[in-house]
């Protein structure tokens, strides 16, 4: 079982670095303008999208996996929210140019062709629109062995340094780029669950007794621990 299959079965709502605590901190530090048309790419089970809908934003959540979207719709129903969820690929977004004011990504772009995804974010943002993208990044000192191990486990096309991210953002038409919250990539799950328990997480039937799920989870934890010197995460804020 691969990493994304594990997340899907568990119905994890905030698997990105820092968890939902990081999401809440980001939205507090960088509040979205009222009335913004917001696209969350890789919305997963819809936790962030539903939170923003509660705050009154016009929010669209997009994900590649129909199983995730089904859980997102269940979450919206449970929270009595009207949220648009769309199945789609971040490298070929099914939206017209300049359709959104804000694009949110939480550890999603890494799992696609990064350059193509960033170009699509730029295409569907209006002039002056903003991308907020929190991603795992490689330190400049990453070894070949660690690079191969991490990209192999997560099935990534590439694991970029901060500088390479900035270069690709610039190449995609983003002129004003800020890097925030750069820190070591460490496990956050327990603290995050205590601070922000997910009351609407939906696990697939039989998941608790599925050994493959927990084997993949342990392998993930071991991988992060073994490569902590080479992994960080950061929030990229880029204005079109």
Q: PLM features: what roles do these ranges have?
A:
Residues 10, 136-156:
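Short, glycine-/aromatic-enriched active-site segment of Class I SAM-dependent methyltransferases
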Residues 16-34:
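Conserved alpha-helix/loop element of class I SAM-dependent methyltransferases that forms part
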Residues 39-41, 45-92:
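Class I SAM-dependent methyltransferase SAM/SAH-binding core
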Residues 91-102:
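A short acidic, Gly/Pro-enriched loop at the edge of an enzyme's catalytic core
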Residues 102-115:
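A short SAM/SAH-binding and catalytic strip from SAM-dependent methyltransferases
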Residues 115-130:
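A short glycine-rich, Lys/Arg-flanked "PGG" loop and its adjoining helix->strand segment in the class I
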Residues 157-173:
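Short alpha-helix
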Residues 178-240:
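Conserved Class I S-adenosyl-L-methionine
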């Amino acid at each position: 079982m691969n990493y994304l299959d594990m997340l899907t079965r568990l119905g994890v709502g905030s698997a990105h670095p820092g968890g939902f605590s990081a999401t809440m901190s980001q939205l507090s530090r960088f509040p979205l303008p009222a009335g913004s048309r917001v696209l969350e790419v890789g919305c997963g089970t819809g936790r962030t999208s539903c939170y923003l809908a509660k705050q009154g934003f016009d929010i669209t959540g997009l994900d590649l996996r129909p199983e995730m979207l089904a859980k997102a719709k269940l979450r919206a129903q449970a929270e009595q929210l009207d949220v648009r969820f769309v199945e789609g690929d971040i490298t070929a977004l099914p939206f017209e140019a300049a359709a959104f004011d804000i694009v949110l990504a939480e550890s999603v772009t890494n799992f696609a062709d990064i350059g193509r995804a960033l170009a699509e974010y730029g295409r569907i943002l209006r002039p002056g629109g903003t991308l907020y993208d929190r991603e795992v990044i490689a330190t400049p000192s990453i070894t070949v062995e660690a690079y191969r191990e991490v990209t192999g486990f997560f099935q990534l096309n590439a694991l970029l340094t901060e500088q390479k991210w900035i270069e690709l953002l610039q190449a995609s038409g983003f002129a004003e780029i800020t890097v925030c919250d750069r820190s070591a990539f460490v496990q956050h799950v327990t603290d995050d669950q205590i601070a922000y328990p997910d009351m609407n997480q939906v696990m697939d039937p039989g998941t608790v007794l599925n050994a493959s799920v927990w084997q993949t989870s342990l392998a993930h934890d071991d991988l992060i621990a073994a490569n902590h010197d080479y992994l960080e995460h950061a929030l990229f804020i880029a204005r079109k």
